Structures are given as C-alpha cells and as structure tokens.
Amino acid sequence: MSANEPGQPPLLSSALSHGEWTSNLQPPHVVLAIGAHPDDIEFGCGGTLAKWAASGAMIHHLVLTDGSKGTWDVDADTAQLIERRQHEQRRAAQRLGATGEVRFLGAVDGELVHDSSMVDTVALAIRQLTPDVVLGHDPWKRYRLHPDHRNAGLITCDAIVAARDPHFLRHHMATHGVPHHRPAALLLWEADEPNHYEDVSGWVDTKLAALEAHESQFESTMKTTDGDLSAFRGRIRDRLATLGAPHGLGAAEIFHLIDQL
C-alpha cells in the first residue's frame, strides 16, 4: 500500500522544501488532532488548525483524558472540573473554526495507559473519521515529564499503524462497519527533532482566542490569578515569532512530519 491511497489528497505535493525542512502542507480535507488533555491541542497546533479550518478542512478533536487534575485547588470538585473542561474544549474548537466532532475518551488525568484497549479505541476513531492528517504529541520528546503526553503520543502512533492495515482490529468492520484507513501524514508537536513548519502569521489571534476559552487553566497553565492575560499572550506571541524567525515568518508552529505511513 502506498502512503497516499486512492481518494487521499497529495498533501506533500505543495509542501515546500527548505534544506531539511518542509513547510505548509496542502490544506487537507479532514484533520484529526489528538491531545492528552483539554487545551493540549490548542497549545500544540491551534494556529495550524485555524488556518486549515478557514480553508474548508473538517477539523476533529480527540481528547484522551478527563482533565480532572488540571487545577491547583486541593478542594476542587473534580466532577465539576471535568464537565467544565469539556465545555471549554468545545468552545475552543469553535473559536478555531472547527466544525467536526469533539470526542472525549475520559481516561483519568495523569493515569493514561498506553495499552491495546486505548490503541483500539483511537484506531477506531481514525477509521471512523478518515483524517488525511493526524496531529499529536511527540512521544520521543526528550525529558518530557508528563506521562500522559508521552503515552498519548505512543497511543497515537500505534493507532495509526493499527488503523491503516486491514488485518489489524478486524472486528471494527464487523462491529462498526468501518474499513481500514491510512492517513497521508502525521504531524507531531513539541517535536524533539522538528522538520516541518506551518506559517501561522495570520492566525495568532485565533490561537490565543481558543486558548483563552480554557478559563479553568488561567491560574495553573497561563500563570494569572487576576484574569489579566497580557503576559500570557506575550509569551505565546514571542514563542511563535521565535519559531517563525529562522524561516522568515512572523509566526510559525513547528512539527516532526512523518509522511511514510
């Protein structure tokens, strides 16, 4: 089987090569972003998703954990926090312009396990949603402390392999009526060895708006206790500008691109 099976767009045909880097995939038709927690997707690839959504792509979100540990408040009602974070994630997706599904798998925050059951579930989502491009955590990021981020990346990579091959997880056809599906490309954010960038110069404000939908994270992740997000916005703008500068861009998000799926 080739990397691009019939019906898939030649996504890399319009990617520009700059030495060891490629840039700006042809806007895909269907995209699946897979994050460990609510807000991980917006941090990792929010500008890219906003750009593709504006080009007509169907953007889907898949969040693996319930986000129940995402607070410094030791007395927090975790059930309420889970519900709140799901609401925030849906609102963030809307702000990116995403019109696809927002799915929550509900694994306990901090206890995400890279096992066959989770790989099966994510592979089923890939087969059902048929993304051209999948985006997720780089599981090989050195010194990555959070186990959910490492495991989410491994689950994503293993699920792509399971979803693409017809003899893996054959019960999906019998039970759900979905055949195998091979995405054309995988983009891993926070990449240990980045080799691809997307120009998001026109989408920084949209990324920020989506991040700011995660109001429960203002204190813990965004480092504000009074609702003043100016310092947080400055950090994000500076980070995107720093990533874009070597490529002559005002802002960029960078990834490790794997296109031999």
What are these regions (language model features)?
Residues 2-129, 256:
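Active-site rim/loop-helix segments in enzyme catalytic domains that contact anionic ligands
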